[in-house]
Amino acid sequence: MNPRRKKRLTLAVALIGGVAAIASLLLYALNSNLNLFFTPTEIVQGKKDTGVMPEIGQRIRVGGMVTVGSMVRDPNSLHVEFAIHDAAGGEIIVTYDDLLPDLFREGQGIVAQGVLSAPGVLEATEVLAKHDENYMPPEVAEAMGQTHEKLDYNQEQKSGGY
């Protein structure tokens, strides 16, 4: 092989290696920042079609209804724990160490984002509450619509009482 061809081959191999390294770093960065959406039932039992369950330490988003009577506040800090459930009967515990949104209340739909710290326990970094009685996050509405009809709220829930 003459020196000119050897130089071209070395350059081509280096270029292909560089592109492969950049692509792998890009995919790694995207994968570590990816937040998959789950319902409480999917966290407990896995997704219906694939059986995929979130791993401990994985960043996820979970949506459902706050279980009435499940909220426990720590009087000495902002720490709060509550359960969320879906129509299929799945329920998980969410822990949160910050101020809850003003519209947050039991019996309402929420989406929580955070890290799965144990089976059935989400350490939330962000909690989003619905805006009014007609709004439901698209992911939650889709998940709830797959299992049963639209949820009806009683008068106490509509008025914002606990």
Swiss-Prot record:
Membrane spanning residue stretches: 9-29
Location of this chain's protein in the cell: Cell inner membrane
InterPro entries membership: CcmE, CcmE-like_sf, NA-bd_OB-fold
MF-aspect GO terms: heme binding; metal ion binding
Periplasmic side: 30-162
Membrane topology: Single-pass type II membrane protein
Pfam families, per the entry: CcmE
GO cellular component entries: plasma membrane
Main location: membrane
Cytoplasmic side: 1-8
BP term (GO), one: cytochrome complex assembly
Annotated positions binding heme: 131, 135
Alphabetized UniProt keyword annotations: Cell inner membrane, Cell membrane, Cytochrome c-type biogenesis, Heme, Iron, Membrane, Metal-binding, Signal-anchor, Transmembrane, Transmembrane helix
Function per UniProt: Heme chaperone required for the biogenesis of c-type cytochromes. Transiently binds heme delivered by CcmC and transfers the heme to apo-cytochromes in a process facilitated by CcmF and CcmH.
Family: Belongs to the CcmE/CycJ family.
Protein name (Swiss-Prot/TrEMBL): Cytochrome c-type biogenesis protein CcmE
Gene giving rise to this polypeptide: ccmE
